[in-house]
């Protein structure tokens, strides 16, 4: 039976998390390993797919490992080629979502079909559509896509809905950066503005350390580690660890023995990275986040002094230099009351509760991050919906023809902020045809934009004279067709079945190993205690099972395992009965001996009393 719960998923660049509403509180669902976040890593090995911690652990030795795929969501034509097969970012993301769905179902004890998934506030339409496609491939109905900073504010504001506050959410994750300004009052979360950079995050901070290590090693040893894939993965792991360590200590030791080899033998990397040096290396990245903060405040028509609360979200906000910079820019001490790795998933779970009706009196009013419009005469970008407009929203405008007797108009839909169409991102094109012949400027063409609650765009063009209408739901240029999505859903399900089958086979082989071991032990214990025929029967069954195991014949293993199991159980019962009989015989002999001893004392009924008397005497002696 499917659960009516809607899980909240933070599909992150480096780590993901999932939460569910229990009672009135959102709760993180832990991974099978007990972790509270899932590394957004997928590995392929011999046709098997691994996701999460296990995939991340073997990344050094397995080149078929994919990480930070979120950076490529919505990217036209981008694919990763693994073991002779191409995968889109949607498919890789779907594998992560499928894994999350699986352990969430184990926790809830029900099938999970619905989810709220978060995206960076500055994700464009193509990236949002790709996220929805990934959910569909994973077998999840994405009930709502919400912006990550908005989700963080939901987690923060759940128990503070009686306050009127202006909140700045500074969200620096593994691969993306967002800043949003929200107003919270009477249970309404209204997003006033949003800004950011979808290609800036903790990965870039790691890269600065990696570059520093590579340059230093090259200067000392004349070896370029950036050309060595395995060394590079070790450097990445060491850089990430050093970055995390420097959030708590002033210097971090980096020790990588046998990182390479030179003419005189193995080479080792041993160095110390101080927090001061780290701050120097990454100062430009921290500074890069300042402009979006200023722009978001400007778009919300606020100054830093108008802010009541500053929330830091995303694991990279643990970096002390980031915290200091945000506090300096805003003049406010940042709020650390929420775990920055978990807030987004918790907020998504709250939104799930809003949708199911479990959370009352909370309304989320999100915004579109970029302006939307069409190309008009002269290649001009004419905006119909300005950025930071609250969604869902609808806007229409009447246009006309540019030439006499023009039979059709091309509707070129764009997203962006530049005045010329060529400088903005194309979302789609369609044509309205069969316009009756008329002088230029006479036909009335109504163009209407609709943005739904997920930020997905629908555009229509209607000839007011004939009522002829043409519509388009914007799919990104990298979006997948329904057929492609259906095929990927099918493949994902097939892989799920294959993975399940593979696990069952491994479990069966383990059971067979254990049974053969138990049989050998039982036969040894039964030596000389059962007939030769029974021993032969057991040995034959054991050998038949061993042969099936050696042949890797799954069906035979199942059948022979059941046969041997029955024989071993029967023998074990016999062994137990023999032990009981032997114990009974021994017990009888002991009773007779005790009875004879008592008779010699001339007592008729003193066996028990005799025992007690002896104990009492012992007590008296003490």
UniProtKB/Swiss-Prot annotation:
Gene Ontology molecular-function annotations: ATP binding; ATP-dependent protein folding chaperone; unfolded protein binding
Keyword Transmembrane helix: no
Residues modified as Phosphothreonine: 176
Pfam families: HSP70
Gene3D superfamilies in alphabetical order: 1.20.1270.10, 3.30.420.40, Actin, Chain A, domain 4 (3.90.640.10), Substrate Binding Domain Of DNAk, Chain A, domain 1 (2.60.34.10)
Family matches, as NCBIfam families: PRK00290.1 (NF001413), prok_dnaK (TIGR02350)
PANTHER family, per the entry: HEAT SHOCK PROTEIN 70KDA
Record's protein name: Chaperone protein DnaK
Lineage of producing organism: Bacteria, Bacillati, Bacillota, Bacilli, Lactobacillales
């Amino acid at each position: 039976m499917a659960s009516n719960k809607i899980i909240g998923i933070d599909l992150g660049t480096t780590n993901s998390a999932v939460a569910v509403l229990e009672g009135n509180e959102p709760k993180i669902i832990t991974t099978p390993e007990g972790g509270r976040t899932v590394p957004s890593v997928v590995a392929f090995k011999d046709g098997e797919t691994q996701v999460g911690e296990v995939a991340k652990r073997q990344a050094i030795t397995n080149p078929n490992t994919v990480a930070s795929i979120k950076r490529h969501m919505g990217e036209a034509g981008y694919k990763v080629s693994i073991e002779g097969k191409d995968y889109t970012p949607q498919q890789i993301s779907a594998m992560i979502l499928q894994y999350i769905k699986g352990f969430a179902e184990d926790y809830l004890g029900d099938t999970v079909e619905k989810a709220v998934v978060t995206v960076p506030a500055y994700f464009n339409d193509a990236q949002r559509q790709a996220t929805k496609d990934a959910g569909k491939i994973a077998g999840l109905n994405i009930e709502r896509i919400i912006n990550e900073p908005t989700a963080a504010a939901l987690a923060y504001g759940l128990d503070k809905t009686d306050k009127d506050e202006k909140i700045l959410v500074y969200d620096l994750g593994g691969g993306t950066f967002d800043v949003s300004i929200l107003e919270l009052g009477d249970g309404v979360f209204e997003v006033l503005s949003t800004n950011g950079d979808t290609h800036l995050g903790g990965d870039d901070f790691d890269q600065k350390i990696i570059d520093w290590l590579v340059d230093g090693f090259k200067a000392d040893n004349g070896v370029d580690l950036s050309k060595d894939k395995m060394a590079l993965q070790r450097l990445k792991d060491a850089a990430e660890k050093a970055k995390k360590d420097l959030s708590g200590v002033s210097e971090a030791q980096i020790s990588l023995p046998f990182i390479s080899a030179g003419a005189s033998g193995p080479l080792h990397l041993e160095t110390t990275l101080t927090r001061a040096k780290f701050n120097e290396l990454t100062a430009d990245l921290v500074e890069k986040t300042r402009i979006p903060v200023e722009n978001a405040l400007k778009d919300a028509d606020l100054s830093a002094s108008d802010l009541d609360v500053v929330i830091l979200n995303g694991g990279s906000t643990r970096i002390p230099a980031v915290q200091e910079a945000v506090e300096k820019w805003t003049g406010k001490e940042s709020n650390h009351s929420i775990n920055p790795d978990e807030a987004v998933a918790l907020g998504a779970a709250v939104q799930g509760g809003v949708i199911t009706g479990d959370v009352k009196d909370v309304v989320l009013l999100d915004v579109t991050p970029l302006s939307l419009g069409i190309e008009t005469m002269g290649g001009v970008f004419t905006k119909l919906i300005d950025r930071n407009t609250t969604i869902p929203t609808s806007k229409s405008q009447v246009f006309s023809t540019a030439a006499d007797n023009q039979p059709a108009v091309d509707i070129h839909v764009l997203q962006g902020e530049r005045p010329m169409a060529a400088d903005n991102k194309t979302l789609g094109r369609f044509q309205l045809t069969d316009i009756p012949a008329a002088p230029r400027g006479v036909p009335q063409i109504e163009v209407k934009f609709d943005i739904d609650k997920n930020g997905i765009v629908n555009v229509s063009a209607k000839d007011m004279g004939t009522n002829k209408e043409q519509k388009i739901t914007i799919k990104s240029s990298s979006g997948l067709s329904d057929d492609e999505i259906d095929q990927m859903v099918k493949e994902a399900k097939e892989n799920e079945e294959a993975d399940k089958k593979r696990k069952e086979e491994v479990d069966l082989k383990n059971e067979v190993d254990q049974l053969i071991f138990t049989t050998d032990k039982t036969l040894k214990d039964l030596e000389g205690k059962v007939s030769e025929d029974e021993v032969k029967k057991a040995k034959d069954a054991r050998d038949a099972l061993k042969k099936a195991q050696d042949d890797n014949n799954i069906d035979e293993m199942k059948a022979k395992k059941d046969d041997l199991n029955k024989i071993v159980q029967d023998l074990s019962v016999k062994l137990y009965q023999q032990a009981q009989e032997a114990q009974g015989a021994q017990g009888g002999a002991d009773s007779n001996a005790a009875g004879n001893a008592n008779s010699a004392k001339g007592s008729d009924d003193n066996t028990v009393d005799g025992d007690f008397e002896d104990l009492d005497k012992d007590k008296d002696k003490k």
